[in-house]
Structures are given as structure tokens and as C-alpha cells.
UniProtKB/Swiss-Prot annotation:
The keyword DNA-binding does not apply. Residues 181-395 form the Radical SAM core domain. Keywords: Iron, Iron-sulfur, Metal-binding, Methyltransferase, S-adenosyl-L-methionine, Transferase. It comes from the Bacteria. The gene is hpnR. The lineage of its organism: Bacteria, Pseudomonadati, Pseudomonadota, Gammaproteobacteria, Methylococcales. This is Hopanoid C-3 methylase. It comes from Methylococcus capsulatus (strain ATCC 33009 / NCIMB 11132 / Bath).
Length: 515
């Protein structure tokens, strides 16, 4: 069958600071290609809706599938699915991805019969089975992970072997368009999948049932050899939890003499526990690291169930500085913040050398906070669930909250991304221009056109086309973790951690999930 795989448009934050290749969709595309299907992939981060329509009309695919990893893309994906079905009534339309797995019934209801099904869970496992069932005219409601208007299949299963597929990077037309800050161009790669912790604001662990699986060093090296871009983003939710795995990969890279610049995300306690791993990766080219600090006081850490003490976080920052790594940290702005709190945050951020990103506390389907805070929501508009809009009641009037938020973001942007900072990176910019790369350069003047309080307020005034359904009111204050899982928990056996690391993880959890 002819299968058209589509990734939706960029969100607010990604219009400025980064544009990452759709790695998950590339893996699904490869699994379908290996099953014998004719695949085309379009990324609307770098192509247009007009391109999408042209491909529909000229190629006339049998199947159109959409990747939906972010809630704010829900309205766009529903509209695109409806458009595909209206132009090609015989085509089969379905949606998969992280966020789609948590809001499947909403997608089908809003699809009004023009969306054939939602595929929950890992796409490499489910998509080939779904298309095989379609080809033999079987009952799709028997496929694991399928949710349709007529029924629901068994729970989704994991991909049997994470080493089986390499991303179908060759299907993307504009690879030079992907970047991450000064890493321009930048590819993405996966070393592990899942997260064994249980932070209340995050759905990474609930999607995977608190599992943690790793790719083999051989598979990772094969993928690395194929990557031509000088920059690489390691997409793992928490990099190098298992020290031995990180060392094995690093030593293999050193033996082959592969030189890249790497950006990864990890936790402060993991960084401190596995110092030798990160020292090795610094030698290999790890220039940038993202740490999810989330809060600068104990109360905030407790709220988000980040069981890493302030002392440990600051110690981790000191260690990263000692290695010469550029560190970016994230703080979560709570809607309860007042002017004084914003000013404290600004002052603190200016006193440290790290890059600081501010996101807005947002309860998402699939998180525990969704079940405890969703009743307070001030909007049910999917578009606003992008961690840059306030969807909970704010202490300040909303215009003032956005004014303080953007003021804080502007201060931090000018600190590290403005023209004054660009003077310190002229060598980097020169190298980019010599290679014909302008993504980072263009990002330097995009900020004010995107991060604008008036634009954020205007977003709230737009009509809600597809309202979000709230969860049932919880009958107990404590949420059972198993009720949140997309993939069923398989307990200890699903985590590729030695006993000492499993104990370390448990000591860093707040006890919500038992599997």
C-alpha cells in the first residue's frame, strides 16, 4: 500500500529555539517500509499545508497516518485528517504518537467519522499489524493498541526488539532545516526508551509503564555512522541512567574516532552518580546538557515530585561547569506566581551562568497532575496546552501574568541568545554560514515576533474548535499509577537496570508507582 506519514507544524517554542527531526515517525516509517509498503514522509515543520494537499492530490495514498506527540497539535491533525478523507474518501486515516495515546476517544469524536482509528503505544509495533489487517480486510478492532469508533483492541505491546529498525532518515527532503540552538544542522538519535521515575507533571513514565529499555551499542554505532550532521541530539528522557551502557557507547565512539557535538538531557542526581560517564562524553564532544531542575526551592520540588534536593541540583551544576559544558535548565512557572516571585526568579537566573528556560505549569492527559488539577482548568482548548500558555487560574490578572512571563523570558533570552551573546559566537555563526546553514542565525531575531503577551492573550480569545474532555472526578486523592499507563507495567523485568541502579532510582522517586 501507498502510505503517507505526516508530522504536524511547529509549536510556539520550536518556532525560535529548535527544530528537531521527527525521529519517532521515521522509525514507524521504516517499520512499514520493511513490511513492504511504499512510504512517503512529510514534516510540516519545514513544509506547508499546500505541499500536503499537493501530495494527496498527485500521489493519492491508500493510507494517511499522522504523528501526534504534542497536545497543541490536536486541532491541526484533526483538520488534516478530515481534509485527507474528504479529498480521498477511500483512503484510511489514523493517528498515533505520544499524546494521541492519551486522548484517543477525543480524537475520534472530533474526527466525526473521517478519522478511522487511533493507534496507541509504540508505532513500530502497532502500525505494521494495523496495515496487515487492513490488507486482508480483517477486523482492525483486534489489533493491539487500536481504538476506533466501533471498538477497541487489546492493550498495545512493546516493540519486540529496539535494535530491529533504524530511522528512515532518507525519506526527509530537508534535513538541513533541523537544528538545536547553535547545533546547526542537528540530527536526533535514541539510546534508550522510557523513564523509571514518576514525576507528577510528566507522562514519559506513564506512557511506557515505568519501563526503561536500551538499544545495543552495535545498533547505536550503526545509526551514528549513517548520520552526516555535525550536531546530534540524544533524545532519551534521561541520558545514561545505567552507567555501563553510557560507557560502552562512548568507548565504541572513541575507538572509531567519530567526532560530533552532542546535546543531551539528564537529571542532576544521575550526573553526580555517573561522573566518569559524563567526563568521557565531554571528551567525545558533549557540548550541551539540559537539566530539568524545575524549581529553586524545596516547596516547588515537592510539588512536582522531583526528589532531587536543591543541594544536589546545585552540586550537579557545579560539576557540569567544571567540565566546561554549557548547561540549560528548565524552571516551571506556576500560575500562582506574583510579581515578586517573577522578580526573584529573574535575579536568580541572572546570577548563574546557565541558560534558563521558563515553561508554564500545565496538567497534561497522562500525568498525575491532570487528574488532580484538571478541574481547575480555565480553558479546554488543545492549542493552549503547549507549556507557554496558562491553562490554570493565575494569581495575577492574565495580561499581567503574561507580561511578567515574557519579561522574564526576554531577560533570559538576551542573556544567552541576543545579539550581545551572538558577538561571542561569531566563529560559530561564521562556520554555519560557510556551510550554508542559517537556522541559528535566523532564530536570533525571531523571539519578539513569537513571545509576545498580546499574541498569547489573543490565543485565548479564539473560538475553541475542539474542546478537550476532562477526566472523571477522582474518587480517591491518590491516583493509581496503573490507571495512567498506556503500556502495561511489566515490573522490574522491564527495566534494563542493574540492582544498584534500580535501588538508586527507587530512592529518587516519591512513591506513586509501584510497578
Amino acid at each position: 500500500m501507498k502510505v503517507f506519514c505526516v508530522h504536524p507544524s511547529p509549536l510556539m517554542y520550536t518556532k525560535v529555539f529548535l527544530r528537531l527531526e521527527p525521529l519517532g515517525l521515521e522509525l514507524v516509517a521504516e517499520s512499514l517500509r520493511r513490511a513492504g509498503h511504499d512510504i512517503r514522509l512529510m514534516d510540516l515543520q519545514v513544509e506547508s499545508h499546500a505541499d500536503f494537499l499537493r501530495e494527496l492530490d498527485t500521489w493519492r495514498p491508500d493510507v494517511v497516518c499522522f504523528s501526534l506527540n504534542y497536545l497543541a497539535n490536536v486541532p491541526e491533525v484533526i483538520d488534516l485528517a478530515k481534509t485527507a478523507k474528504s479529498r480521498l474518501p477511500e483512503c484510511f486515516t489514523f493517528v498515533g504518537g505520544h499524546s494521541a495515546s492519551f486522548v484517543a476517544k477525543d480524537l475520534l469524536d472530533h474526527g466525526e467519522g473521517l478519522l478511522d482509528c487511533v493507534l496507541r503505544g509504540e508505532g513500530e509495533a502497532g502500525a505494521p499489524k494495523l496495515l496487515e489487517t487492513l490488507a486482508r480486510r480483517g477486523n482492525i478492532d483486534e489489533v493491539p493498541g487500536v481504538v476506533s469508533l466501533t471498538g477497541e483492541g487489546p492493550p498495545p505491546g512493546f516493540t519486540d526488539n529496539l535494535d530491529e529498525h533504524l530511522p528512515a532518515r532518507d525519506l526527509l527532503k530537508y534535513r538541513r532545516k533541523y537544528f538545536l540552538g547553535t547545533l546547526d544542522p542537528c540530527a536526533s538519535i535514541e539510546f534508550s526508551r522510557g523513564c523509571p521515575w514518576d514525576c507528577s507533571f510528566c507522562s514519559a513514565w506513564t506512557f511506557y509503564g515505568r519501563s526503561y529499555r536500551v538499544m545495543s551499542t552495535e545498533r547505536i554505532m550503526e545509526d551514528l555512522r549513517r548520520i552526516k550532521e555535525p550536531g546530534i541530539f540524544i533524545v532519551d528522557d534521561v541520558a545514561f541512567i545505567q552507567a555501563q551502557h553510557g560507557m560502552e557507547i562512548g568507548e565504541a565512539i572513541a575507538r572509531e574516532g567519530i567526532r560530533k557535538q552532542y546535546y543531551l538531557e539528564t537529571r542532576g542526581d544521575v550526573l553526580l552518580r555517573n561522573k566518569e560517564v559524563f567526563k568521557l562524553w565531554k571528551k567525545l564532544g558533549m557540548e550541551y546538557m539540559f537539566l530539568g531542575v524545575e524549581a529553586i526551592d524545596a516547596e516547588g520540588l515537592q510539588k512536582f515530585r522531583k526528589r532531587v534536593s536543591l543541594g544536589k541540583n546545585f552540586e550537579a551544576l557545579e560539576f557540569a561547569r567544571s567540565l566546561g559544558i554549557t548547561v540549560a535548565i528548565n524552571l516551571i512557572a506556576d500560575p500562582d506566581w506574583d510579581r515578586e516571585r517573577f522578580e526573584v526568579i529573574r535575579q536568580w537566573c541572572m546570577e548563574i551562568p546557565e541558560i534558563v528556560n521558563i515553561s508554564v505549569n500545565t496538567p497534561y492527559p497522562g500525568t498525575e497532575s491532570w487528574h488532580t488539577e484538571s478541574r481547575q482548568l480555565t480553558t479546554r482548548d488543545y492549542r493552549l496546552f503547549d507549556i507557554q500558555h496558562a491553562v490554570l487560574p493565575t494569581r495575577l490578572p492574565l495580561p499581567e501574568f503574561y507580561g511578567e512571563l515574557v519579561k522574564t523570558q526576554q531577560v533570559l533570552y538576551k542573556k544567552h541568545m541576543g545579539w550581545a551573546a551572538a558577538r561571542d559566537t561569531l566563529k560559530i555563526l561564521g562556520g554555519h554560514l560557510l556551510r550554508g546553514q542559517t537556522n541559528f542565525l535566523r532564530s536570533l531575531w525571531k523571539f519578539n515576533s513569537v513571545f509576545n503577551p498580546e499574541l498569547q492573550l489573543a490565543d485565548h480569545r479564539q473560538p475553541v474548535k475542539y474542546p478537550m474532555t476532562l477526566p472523571p472526578a477522582p474518587t480517591e486523592q491518590k491516583i493509581e499509577a496503573k490507571t495512567l499507563y498506556v503500556h502495561r507495567s511489566q515490573g522490574r523485568k522491564s527495566r534494563a537496570l542493574d540492582d544498584a541502579t534500580e535501588k538508586f532510582v527507587d530512592e529518587g522517586r516519591m512513591g506513586a508507582a509501584t510497578g
